[in-house]
């Protein structure tokens, strides 16, 4: 039980939750205030994308710290098999995320809807033929790969939390927010040729 209260695991859990809270809160804040667009201009979404990538890397760092502190705590496979399965899952997850980025573009992948970049229609091609939220599936599978490769109980616990937090976020926060955005297109879509109008 004491092992389950490891500070490394707790920090990883906090990082997982805070990353999702971070992008939900900042996206809704921008949508309601246009603060970042007023401050930075039409390229605000690209700075925001970098911000979210850094946030995700910080989360991943703390997950890796927890996993490495717990390496080989649950031996499910011989090392060679664990490496092969883990690496395969990790690569698949990363490739799925790259495929999602290709399908959505930077604006679609990183909450561009909240920044006034409204899509004409939902994306149904690419990975969306198979998953409703492929970027979350990809990240979860990549985390699973890390857990398997290191045969770490902490890794599996982090993977479960990643999946659960993504599911809760997508179902109860992001979907209602997107419905609100697209039901009010006149407000949601920004005329980037006339950003001065946002200050009125």
From Swiss-Prot:
Domain of life where this protein originates: Eukaryota
Pathway(s) it belongs to: Phospholipid metabolism; phosphatidylcholine biosynthesis
GO cellular component, one term: mitochondrial membrane
Regions of this protein lying in the Lumenal compartment: 1-8, 30-39, 108-150
InterPro entries: PEMT/MFAP (IPR024960), Phopholipid_MeTrfase (IPR007318)
EC number(s) on file: 2.1.1.17, 2.1.1.71
TM segment ranges: 40-58, 87-107, 151-171
Record topology, Cytoplasmic segments: 59-86, 172-200
Catalytic activity field: a 1,2-diacyl-sn-glycero-3-phospho-N-methylethanolamine + S-adenosyl-L-methionine = a 1,2-diacyl-sn-glycero-3-phospho-N,N-dimethylethanolamine + S-adenosyl-L-homocysteine + H(+); a 1,2-diacyl-sn-glycero-3-phospho-N,N-dimethylethanolamine + S-adenosyl-L-methionine = a 1,2-diacyl-sn-glycero-3-phosphocholine + S-adenosyl-L-homocysteine + H(+); a 1,2-diacyl-sn-glycero-3-phosphoethanolamine + S-adenosyl-L-methionine = a 1,2-diacyl-sn-glycero-3-phospho-N-methylethanolamine + S-adenosyl-L-homocysteine + H(+)
Chain residues that bind S-adenosyl-L-methionine: 91-93, 174-175
GO MF: phosphatidyl-N-methylethanolamine N-methyltransferase activity; phosphatidylethanolamine N-methyltransferase activity
UniProt intramembrane stretches: 9-29
GO biological process: methylation; phosphatidylcholine biosynthetic process
Keyword Thylakoid in record: no
Protein's cellular compartments: Endoplasmic reticulum membrane; Mitochondrion membrane
Its membrane topology: Multi-pass membrane protein
Keywords: Endoplasmic reticulum, Lipid biosynthesis, Lipid metabolism, Membrane, Methyltransferase, Mitochondrion, Phospholipid biosynthesis, Phospholipid metabolism, S-adenosyl-L-methionine, Transferase, Transmembrane, Transmembrane helix
Family: Belongs to the class VI-like SAM-binding methyltransferase superfamily. PEMT/PEM2 methyltransferase family.
Functional note: Catalyzes the three sequential steps of the methylation pathway of phosphatidylcholine biosynthesis, the SAM-dependent methylation of phosphatidylethanolamine (PE) to phosphatidylmonomethylethanolamine (PMME), PMME to phosphatidyldimethylethanolamine (PDME), and PDME to phosphatidylcholine (PC).
Name of the molecule in the record: Phosphatidylethanolamine N-methyltransferase B
Species of origin: Dictyostelium discoideum (Social amoeba)
Gene: pemtB
């Amino acid at each position: 039980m004491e092992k389950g209260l490891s500070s490394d695991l707790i920090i990883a859990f906090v990082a997982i939750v805070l990353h999702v809270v971070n992008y939900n809160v900042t996206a809704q804040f921008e949508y309601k205030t246009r603060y970042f667009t007023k401050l930075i201009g039409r390229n605000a979404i690209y700075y925001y994308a970098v911000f979210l990538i850094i946030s995700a890397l910080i989360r991943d760092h703390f997950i890796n710290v927890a996993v490495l502190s717990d390496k080989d705590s649950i031996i499910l496979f011989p090392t060679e098999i664990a490496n092969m399965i883990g690496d395969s899952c990790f690569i698949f997850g990363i490739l799925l995320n790259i495929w999602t980025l290709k399908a959505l573009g930077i604006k679609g992948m990183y909450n561009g809807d909240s920044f006034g970049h409204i899509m004409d229609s939902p994306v149904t091609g690419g990975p969306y033929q198979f998953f409703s939220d492929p970027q979350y599936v990809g990240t979860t599978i990549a985390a699973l790969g890390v857990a398997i490769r290191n045969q770490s109980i902490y890794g599996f616990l982090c993977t479960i939390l990643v999946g659960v937090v993504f599911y809760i976020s997508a179902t109860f926060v992001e979907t209602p927010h997107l419905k609100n955005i697209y039901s009010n297109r006149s407000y949601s879509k920004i005329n980037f040729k006339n950003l001065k109008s946002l200050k009125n």
